[in-house]
């Protein structure tokens, strides 16, 4: 009698995603059969990313992992903006890169390199997969000039300050945000000579007598590309128009993405009409803000939470990833240290369960057995329902809690789900969660020495000394865990 291996699980639930452009859930129909092409607005590398910024990239990573889980060949592009992003997000203020370079007395190129590396370190810490391509804005300036030349005659006009896009030349401008195009609406400050309040610069001229650190020759004079032009060009160059999905934070829904769409309409058709077909991407997706009790997180106040601060306090970055997954991406997520602590506790429970499972199943089965098919189907249904991670996590924890099942099959099911959630539980060690808080005087060797002394005291039945040592250890910010193989953990504030 031959023994047949279980058939591979094939996710079959229809994938439905919320399209900000149409304001409804839509079935995902790839532009190219069997493929998914995704562009995500990346950081402007003038400062460290805060954890609210990083929520956008956890969301984009989750989307990409889900598309891969659904059997699609994923091409994911994330840009790095190293020029052209003004402090006002529209057409007022100065370039954020130039402002930081002046503040830190460094070149813009040094600023870009430093903060790009800092961003990539956070990407790695949060177990965000590398995209197929990082596109760096300054590497695409010739293509940006060519794009602007193609649309300039019918859709742009020139002022002393730059080349501006006339939003009245495309159909239904601002559909994404229902933005107003009239002057005085308060959405965008006026620039002298603009035809419409919402018109925006696609090329900013260097003022006479000035020299910027980043500037290029163009048909409209020496200058630099506008922020909105950059994303239109990089997404179209790498993915081609139309592509499947464009992601970004909800703040992009107001100005940046409507302007991208307007440019794409102008580029993709002769009359600027037909928003759904010519918006560049078929589906536009936006994650909501991370908020504190004082309001949404931003860098403008000069006070914001970096991922490194969480680590300095002893929290593993994947606890923050789990915190993000506990809320739907379109919902506001309130950050609190209590909430982060609860996510860390939940992550520890998961890791303990996976660790115990790995002891029973040294190898992962090639495929989960049929016992796990209903769970995988529920997990698939949750993720296919506009990335319902809260339900998916519940199903995942149900699987972790199953008893009297084949451990190798169970580990295969856990691995399949975690490949989507991205918590890295099969590779993570419990000791990795034990991060020493910054400023704590004692190190791990010192703790182990005290624990050895306490162990000796208990062996000698010197319970008074044992209790005194436990108190001494606790006073140093350490929790002793008798009976747990890990032995101890840091107490986190």
UniProtKB/Swiss-Prot annotation:
Q: What is its EC number?
A: 6.1.1.16
Q: Which GO terms describe its cellular component?
A: cytosol
Keyword vocabulary terms for this entry: Aminoacyl-tRNA synthetase, ATP-binding, Cytoplasm, Ligase, Metal-binding, Nucleotide-binding, Protein biosynthesis, Zinc
Q: What class of enzyme is it?
A: ligase
Keyword Aminoacyl-tRNA synthetase found: yes
Q: Which PANTHER family match?
A: CYSTEINE--TRNA LIGASE, CYTOPLASMIC, CYSTEINYL-TRNA SYNTHETASE
On whether Chloroplast is a keyword of this UniProt record, the answer is: no
Q: Which GO MF terms does the UniProt record name? A: ATP binding; cysteine-tRNA ligase activity; zinc ion binding
Which InterPro entries does the entry mention? Cys-tRNA-ligase, Cys-tRNA-synt_Ia_DALR, Cys-tRNA/MSH_ligase, CysS_C, Rossmann-like_a/b/a_fold, tRNA-synt_1_cat_dom, tRNAsynth_Ia_anticodon-bd
Record-level GO BP terms: cysteinyl-tRNA aminoacylation
Q: What is annotated about its quaternary structure and interactions?
A: Monomer.
Q: Where is this motif: 'HIGH' region?
A: 43-53
Member of which family? Answer: Belongs to the class-I aminoacyl-tRNA synthetase family.
> Which cofactors is this protein said to need?
Zn(2+)
| Motif 'KMSKS' region, residue range(s) on this chain | 296-300
Please give the catalytic activity noted in the UniProt record.
Answer: tRNA(Cys) + L-cysteine + ATP = L-cysteinyl-tRNA(Cys) + AMP + diphosphate
Q: Which residues bind ATP?
A: 299
The compartments listed are: Cytoplasm
| Family matches, as NCBIfam families | cysS
For this chain's record, the cofactor binding note is:
Binds 1 zinc ion per subunit.
Tell me which residues bind Zn(2+): 41, 231, 256, 260
A Pfam family per the record:
CysS_C
Q: Which CDD domains match?
A: CysRS_core (cd00672)
Q: What is this protein called?
A: Cysteine--tRNA ligase
């Amino acid at each position: 009698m031959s023994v047949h291996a279980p058939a591979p699980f094939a996710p079959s639930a229809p994938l439905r995603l919320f399209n900000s452009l149409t304001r409804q859930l839509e079935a995902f129909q790839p532009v190219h059969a069997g493929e998914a092409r995704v562009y995500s607005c990346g950081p402007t590398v003038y400062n460290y990313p805060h954890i609210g910024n990083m929520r956008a990239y956890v969301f984009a990573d989750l989307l990409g992992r889900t598309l891969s889980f659904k059997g699609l060949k994923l091409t994911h592009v994330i840009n790095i903006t190293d020029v052209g992003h003004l402090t006002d997000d529209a057409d007022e203020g100065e370039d954020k890169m130039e402002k930081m370079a002046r503040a830190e007395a460094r070149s813009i190129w040094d600023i870009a390199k430093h903060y790009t590396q800092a961003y990539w370190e956070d990407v790695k810490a949060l177990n965000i997969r590398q995209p197929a391509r990082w596109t760096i804005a300054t590497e695409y300036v010739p293509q940006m000039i060519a794009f602007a030349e193609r649309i300039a005659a019918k859709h742009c006009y020139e002022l002393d300050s730059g080349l501006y896009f006339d939003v009245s030349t495309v159909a239904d401008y601002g559909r994404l945000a229902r933005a107003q195009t009239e002057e005085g609406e308060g959405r965008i400050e006026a620039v002298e000579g603009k035809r419409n309040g919402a018109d925006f610069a696609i090329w900013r001229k260097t003022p006479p007598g000035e020299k910027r650190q980043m500037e290029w020759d163009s048909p409209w004079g020496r200058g630099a590309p506008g922020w909105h032009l950059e994303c239109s060009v990089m997404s179209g160059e790498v993915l081609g128009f139309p592509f499947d999905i464009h992601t970004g934070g909800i703040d992009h829904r107001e100005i940046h993405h409507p302007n991208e769409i307007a440019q794409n309409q102008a580029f993709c058709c002769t009359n600027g009409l037909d928003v759904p077909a010519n918006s560049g991407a078929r589906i536009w997706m936006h994650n909501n803000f991370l908020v504190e009790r004082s309001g949404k997180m931003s860098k403008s106040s000069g006070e914001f939470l970096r991922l490194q601060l969480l680590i300095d306090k002893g929290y593993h970055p994947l606890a923050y990833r789990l915190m993000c997954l506990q809320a739907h991406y379109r919902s506001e997520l309130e950050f609190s240290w209590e909430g982060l602590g609860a996510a860390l506790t939940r992550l520890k429970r998961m890791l303990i369960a996976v660790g115990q499972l790995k002891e029973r199943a040294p190898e992962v089965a090639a495929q989960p057995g049929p016992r796990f098919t209903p769970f995988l189907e529920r997990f698939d249904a949750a993720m296919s329902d506009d990335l319902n991670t809260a339900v998916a996590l519940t199903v995942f924890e149900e699987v972790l809690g199953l008893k009297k099942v084949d451990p190798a099959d169970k580990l295969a099911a856990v691995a399949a789900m975690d490949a989507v959630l991205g918590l890295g539980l099969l590779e993570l060690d419990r000791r990795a969660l034990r991060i020493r808080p910054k400023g704590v005087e004692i190190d791990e060797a010192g703790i182990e020495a005290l624990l050895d002394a306490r162990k000796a005291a208990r062996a000698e039945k010197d319970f008074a000394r044992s209790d005194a040592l436990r108190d001494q250890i606790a006073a140093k910010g350490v929790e002793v865990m008798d009976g747990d193989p890990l032995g101890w953990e840091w107490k986190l504030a």
